[in-house]
Amino acid sequence: MVAYSPIIATYGNRAEQFLETDSDFAKYHAKLNKKLQHLRSRCHLVTKDTKKYSSKNKYGEINSEDYDNKTKLIGVLILLHAERDLALAETLKLRARQRGKLKKSEEKVLSTRLKKACKTADKLVNVTQNEQQWITRAQYLAFAKLVHSEYLINGKRFKRKDNAKISNNLALVFAALEHLKNLSLLAEEVVDNIVNKYQYSLKQYAGNLITTPEINNFIVERVQSDENKDDELVKLLLDNGFNMKKITTSTEDQKVTTNINWRSFNAKIIDAEVAQFLEQGLSIHPTQITQYTQRLSKLEKALDRHEFFIANHDDQDDIDEMVENSSENNQIILAYIKYNILLTSISRERDLFTHLWNQWLKLNTSLPSKLTKYKEMERIVKNLTKYLSDIMELPGVYSDDELLSQLDLCKLYFQLFLNTGCLSVLYQSKGRYMEALALYVDAYRRLENKLSEIESLDEILLPANLLSLNSVRSLQKRIENGGNSVITLAEYEKRNHGGSLGKYDLTVIEKLDSKKILPTDIQLKNLFPLKPKMLPIPSKPTLFDLAFNYITYDKQEPSASQVKDSVTETESISQTPISNEQTEGEPKKKRGFLGLFGR
């Protein structure tokens, strides 16, 4: 019979879903809500009558007898209640990390939720006290200790933390996880994720532990101490074959030197811890995305240890005797470790990008789903661009023209892959073929210009999963094929766009009675007028006559025809009688318009 694993159901589920940002944990929180609704229904704990709900709440009356006799899902229900509070706490912590600090309201919510999670964890331990499977029971106990440690570290707002309790809980949890991992009852990735999350806290609250042997020995001491002899988790471990031993290290083993040959630089690692962590990290070759955490963890430990070594041992006589230029030697090692950390992060993001690209290829034609996936891939490409920019600024990299050009090409590769593989497809699905063609043309020009700047790609200095000659050629072929596939549609769209409805052109429905309708006129946007249009109208003659009365012209010599007309007009005027009001000395007034504009 396979035992239920609470650790995999919580921390393992987090690792599988790649929860990294606050929005990821918010989505995870929503998923937990749906699971809890389903579990409450299956456990018959739904109270439909909400009047005086506290007296009718079935969840508060759960006890160990219900867990033993009714269903084991009650334990899962309580477990996920605590996990939901932890997910909200992780969301607030990540938001505070981005902002730089917690808001006062967030501090209160964080403390309240972690305190509630502690109460839920205590209830979980109490309800599952008769669990027959020691594997499940041990994980319930370990989960409860992790929740209490989380509350003491981040939830309880005191200047002085309970160092002894925090370090003791974490040590026992680490012992349980290591034992279950050795028995192949827990996946190594899940255990490493938890250890990486809380190892720094263990080092800090246990008295500034530094080396791996020191941490191992502290864990063994906590398990074997008289203080924990009555602890249920310790009893379960000892009864089921726990045999972790202390590690003894000699001073001679700590003076191991390791040579580094990186590009044109040579250096020697003096500190044994740095050499050990670096060797362990570089020996890990991840085949899955979750395994990158192990490699990064080892390399970051090497970085921390080397920075500590520089701060405390720089420019000392014993080191100067072993290395000619110790300061330069230390800086080379520092740059080398940072280079490998960034390169590992880039490889991880590259695998994530490949994973999302495979999901993109399997998507249906639904535009919202493709748009959501595109945004996820765009976020990964931004991370890749940032990591590549950081690695290009490292000492020893920005002065290496060949390596720098290949890193720049790698950055361009991912940007063009996203534009031509995803964004152009989205434009095509919306019928905007000219924009899609513009993306292909721009990608082709940028890639050709970049390749012309690089002398040769015969020797690739980056890992094959990041950049290779085949991948560059494949991208070139994709760009050419994509451009060829859309150029005809773009030309057709351009013609239609060029002959589209003008400002004063009539629509189809306006041409029904008066004008001939051509097949090219029939378009969805040209069937009937959608917006009011301002059309020109002819001016009224009366307005022109009114203006003419007030226009004067320069005197010009009249032509023969004008003289003849004027003579005829004079004769006709002389025949009309002149009123008594007009005198010979008065000038003639121009007639006004309706008697309003006369003078």
UniProtKB/Swiss-Prot annotation:
Organism domain of life: Eukaryota
Region Disordered, as annotated, extends over 559-599
User: Which GO CC annotations does the UniProt entry carry?
Assistant: cytoplasm; nuclear periphery; nucleolus; signal recognition particle, endoplasmic reticulum targeting
- Example GO biological process: SRP-dependent cotranslational protein targeting to membrane
In terms of CDD domains, this protein maps to: SRP68-RBD (cd15481)
Q: Which UniProt keywords apply?
A: Cytoplasm, Nucleus, Ribonucleoprotein, RNA-binding, Signal recognition particle
**Does the keyword field hold Acetylation?**
no
Q: Which residues form a coiled coil?
A: none
Disulfide bonds listed in the record: none
Which residue windows does the record flag with biased composition (Polar residues)? 559-582
Any one Gene Ontology molecular-function term assigned to this protein's record: 7S RNA binding
Q: Which Pfam families match?
A: SRP68
Quote the subcellular location field of this record.
Cytoplasm; Nucleus, Nucleolus
Location, primary (coarse class): cytoplasm
* Oligomer status and interactors: Heterodimer with SRP72. SRP68-SRP72 heterodimer formation is stabilized by the presence of 7SL RNA. Component of a fungal signal recognition particle (SRP) complex that consists of a 7SL RNA molecule (scR1) and at least six protein subunits: SRP72, SRP68, SRP54, SEC65, SRP21 and SRP14.
- Misc remark: Present with 6280 molecules/cell in log phase SD medium.
Q: Which family does the UniProt entry place this protein in?
A: Belongs to the SRP68 family.
What's this chain's function? Component of the signal recognition particle (SRP) complex, a ribonucleoprotein complex that mediates the cotranslational targeting of secretory and membrane proteins to the endoplasmic reticulum (ER). The SRP complex interacts with the signal sequence in nascent secretory and membrane proteins and directs them to the membrane of the ER. The SRP complex targets the ribosome-nascent chain complex to the SRP receptor (SR), which is anchored in the ER, where SR compaction and GTPase rearrangement drive cotranslational protein translocation into the ER.
Q: What is this protein called?
A: Signal recognition particle subunit SRP68
Q: What gene, per UniProt, encodes this protein?
A: SRP68
